[in-house]
Amino acid sequence: MFTEELMYDVLRHFAFNPTDDQMFAADIFSRFMTDRDERCVMILRGIAGTGKTSLAGAIVRTMMDLKQKVTLLAPTGRAAKVFSQNSGQPAATVHRCIYREKAFTGLDGKFNLNVNLFRDRLFMVDEASMISLSSNNSTFGSGCLLDDLVQYVYNDRNCRMLLIGDKAQLPPVGEEESPALRADVMRAYGLTVYECDLNEVLRQSQDSGILYNATVIRQMITHNEATQLPKIRFNGFADISVVPGDELIESLASSYPEVGMDETMVITRSNKRANIFNQGIRNMVLGREEELTTGDMLMVVKNKYKAPHNPSEQGEVQTAVGEMTGKDPSHRNISSFGGIAGGFIANGDRATVRRVRNVRELYGFRFADVTLSFPDYDNTEEDMVVILDTLKTEAPALTHEQNEQLFQRVMEDYADIPLKADRMKKLREDDYYNALQVKFGYAITCHKAQGGQWAHVYLDQGYMTDEMLTPDYIHWLYTAFTRATEHLYLVNWPKTQIE
């Protein structure tokens, strides 16, 4: 009986009549939540325009009405912000929820898996297609994010997890599919799997050229029939258009005041192309000649681990995780939601420059003192040192050789300290060795854009031929198309790819 009541509660929280797929998903969700086996997981897969966001919002509102505990998570700060806006409740990044920093033992920061002290709680993870199964980051826990997430959630206290995502998007780097959206992968953890797919495009989405073309591209993925580059339909749609290269500056200059710089993004295929666009936008659209100035948008390109200023800062209570339904003072982790203090600034986080001062050259590199605000974390402001060399390089961040050079030069300053542990402690606190590595954030690659959405997206695919067509390109194109919420501009789109 309660299973049916829960299903109807979810359906009641829709703002419009749900589709058959959404009704089926609500039924699956109610069965998942009422299963007496607490080691169960639900996978909700849905393509763009099928109402994943609406369903997730209805589930959150239902849980709130029933006074049930729920935590909203996403892989990146931007994705967490979008999830929060769409659901009306706070959301946090997966890393800030499940990891805590251990005592310093070496050169780099190391984060251990946190202990989940919650009970009777649903963890909803959006953009789960980005969660990796590969062991490629030993800084965090086991190095495998999906392993750690499962271990964290399932704590024998009746916690369970709902994974939400789109399997047509780019999978994690180095993987062919998104493991967190695969039932066989989740069963391998000893979990009972509930799963459903949303495929029916909402009626209000059918007038969208963005979603129409994204659906066509997605079908190429589903049927594995990509033998030539997809042709895009523009006729009859007001939300998708071609922008010739000689009109790009004027178009961007219109988008910035219309929807805001924070809601405008150029997406391209390489760091080299992103650098070209970033310099062009700063010089020709924004009229900025300084190397770095107030108002510049930046993207962090390497994790920065912050040494806490006092012991209590290390264990700040995570407000986004538990505070929807009351604080749990025993649950301590990296940082409080809405603040960066005591934790880390993640690769991919966005920042806006508030002040720049004291530019200088040391150790063969150039640095500046800056005040940054972080729009995905309630515009929290932080004073820190940034390294200017990464702004224009084609490499994703400082190269291994550059990092080694900086390490050796900084360590010379601490050569008079006899104990290695004490030297390493000084290095860990050194502003220059730990300077934030950033690039300009007006144009980014699609992997950096994943999980985010912007009102106006300018898409540059660069030179492509049928011979260059790969499954990865189709996933890339689908992911890029679905980053736009209001208008998608295709930059220098070839006539051969117009329907």
Question: Where are the language model's segments positioned?
Answer:
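Conserved helicase motor core of P-loop NTPases
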Residues: 4-5, 29, 37, 154-159, ...
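Catalytic phosphate/metal-binding cores of nucleic-acid and nucleotide-processing enzymes, i.e., regions
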Residues: 39, 77, 333, 344, ...
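Conserved pre-motif I regulatory segment
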Residues: 2-40
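Short, solvent-exposed amphipathic alpha-helical segments in soluble enzyme
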Residues: 88, 281-285, 474-478
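ASCE P-loop NTPase helicase motor core
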Residues: 27, 31, 36, 40-228
